[in-house]
């Protein structure tokens, strides 16, 4: 697919030599042929030239190398043509393998750390729940002790209530406490 800019003709109206100047006959190219090309067309041109050179090198290598009067396999000529590209791919694979291992190790460490944190928080939660139960029991025991003491207490409270008022308030608190629990 080719992008079309304002003022340009469509691809069907233009020959291949007009789009890609390198397809023109040798010696007919001038600087103006390349001056007004867009970056996209320049990139297409660059790839076309590279492909042309690669095809030419591969075909000449196939013609020159034979074993038992048979042409070599395409993979052999490919590795002869671009050993630096194979090396670059190998190094990239190696770096990718190392990066993937590093990522897996990092993920494993993070998972282990989160697991330890979760276990620690569950332990703290269990301790706090036990402490809550212990405090509830202590509260009930203190309310019971206060209830036993109130009938014998003759001291008036600071707010002016009598021990009987306090006792009724205490019974009400016990009822509310049992309803909440």
Swiss-Prot record:
Main location: nucleus
Domain bZIP span(s) in chain numbering: 86-149
One record GO biological process: gluconeogenesis
Disulfide bonds: none
GO molecular function, one term: DNA-binding transcription activator activity, RNA polymerase II-specific
Covalent link (Glycyl lysine isopeptide (Lys-Gly) (interchain with G-Cter in SUMO2)) residue numbers: 78, 175
Protein name (database record): Cyclic AMP-dependent transcription factor ATF-3
Gene this chain is encoded by: Atf3
């Amino acid at each position: 697919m080719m992008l079309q800019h304002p003022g340009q003709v469509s691809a069907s109206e233009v020959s291949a030599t007009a789009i890609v100047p390198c397809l023109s006959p040798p010696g007919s190219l001038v600087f103006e042929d390349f001056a007004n090309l867009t970056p996209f067309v320049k990139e297409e041109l660059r790839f076309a030239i590279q492909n042309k050179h690669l095809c030419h090198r591969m075909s000449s290598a196939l013609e020159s190398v034979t074993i038992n009067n048979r042409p070599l396999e395409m993979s052999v000529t490919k590795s002869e043509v671009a050993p630096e590209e194979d090396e670059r791919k190998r190094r990239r694979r190696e770096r990718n393998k190392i990066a993937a291992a590093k990522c897996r190790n990092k993920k494993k460490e993070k998972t282990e750390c989160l697991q330890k944190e979760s276990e620690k928080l569950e332990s703290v939660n269990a301790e706090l729940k036990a402490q809550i139960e212990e405090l509830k029991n202590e509260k009930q025991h203190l309310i019971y002790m206060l209830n036993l003491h109130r009938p014998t207490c003759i001291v008036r409270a600071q707010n002016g209530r009598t021990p009987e008022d306090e006792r009724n308030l205490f019974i009400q608190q016990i009822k509310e406490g049992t309803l909440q629990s």
